[in-house]
A protein has these predicted regions:
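Extracytoplasmic/peripheral linker and loop segments enriched in polar/acidic and small residues
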Residues: 1, 9-10, 19-21, 49, ...
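Append "and occasionally in soluble cytosolic enzymes with long acidic Gly/Pro-rich linkers
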Residues: 1-103, 174-179, 198, 205
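Loop/turn elements at helix/coil->beta-strand transitions in domains of secreted/extracellular proteins
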Residues: 5-8, 80-82, 107-111, 134-139, ...
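Surface-exposed intrinsically disordered loops and tails
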Residues: 36-46, 127-133, 166-170
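Extracellular/periplasmic catalytic domains that process cell-envelope and extracellular macromolecules
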Residues: 76-79, 131-135, 181, 210-212
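Short helices/loops that flank or line small-molecule/ion binding pockets
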Residues: 99-108, 121-137
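Ligand-binding clamshell of periplasmic/extracellular solute-binding protein-like
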Residues: 117, 137-156
Length: 221
């Protein structure tokens, strides 16, 4: 909510990506075909566009995540919120995006520092889904599927399905090891669902889950 997505799109993507004002965030790519596969009105209240510093602060305040000692950083259960955001070294577009994420944290009282390991180290850590991610990988970037004949189902599966949790070598997705039985059931049912209304309802529910629980979030199209 607090991230300056227009800056990411302008700098990291050299304006070669739709903005979230133009195409509100969901689980779909920005093409008309995929955008028609869910009910945008049903999730409109969840589709933040970014740069909403005051809105993000208000949510944190409401949740009781406040700066109780006046040092400028918020705490939760007595612990200062301090995270490391990371992506591979030398991936300049990703690094530019990660710096914007870190800057957003500071604006709302969350300490986010950046670190850029070499790709060989990074990919070994992130794709190991049979153990919790180690220190230094609190926030990290990876890719998701683009257009293709199995989309948007394939992309959603790789973002949300718990089937990848526990894999010693996971190049598929869900690298944050998210698990939601309702999402799993919807994903498993989609390939055999043929009724257009049922498909749209299922995709809409998956978008709602994704935007409500935020197991990950998109920085750019």
């Amino acid at each position: 909510m607090a991230v300056d997505y227009p800056t990411i799109i302008a700098n990291a993507m050299t304006n070669q990506s739709a903005t979230f004002d133009q195409v509100p965030r969901s689980l779909m790519n920005p093409t008309p075909g995929e955008q028609a596969m869910y009910n945008r009105d049903a999730v409109a209240d969840l589709q933040w566009a970014g740069n909403d510093i005051e809105g993000a602060k208000a949510l944190l305040d409401e949740a009781g995540v406040v700066d109780s000692d006046g040092d400028g950083w918020r705490e939760f259960n007595g612990q200062k919120l301090s995270y490391v955001a990371t992506c591979p070294n030398g991936w300049s577009d990703w690094q530019a995006a990660i710096e914007v994420v870190a800057a957003a944290g500071k604006k709302i009282g969350i300490d986010i520092t950046t670190n850029y390991p070499e790709w060989g180290v990074y990919q070994t850590v992130v794709t190991k889904s049979d153990a919790p991610l180690p220190e230094g990988y609190d926030i990290f970037m990876m890719w998701s599927d683009g257009a293709g004949p199995t989309q948007p189902w394939g992309r959603i599966r790789k973002l949300l399905s718990s089937e990848f949790v526990g894999m010693a070598s996971n190049w598929n997705g869900n690298w944050g090891q998210y698990s939601n039985p309702e999402a799993d059931a919807l994903i498993q049912a989609l390939p055999t669902t043929t009724d257009p209304d049922e498909l749209k309802a299922a995709y809409t529910k998956l978008v709602e889950i994704y935007l409500t629980e935020v197991p990950s979030f998109t920085l750019m199209y």
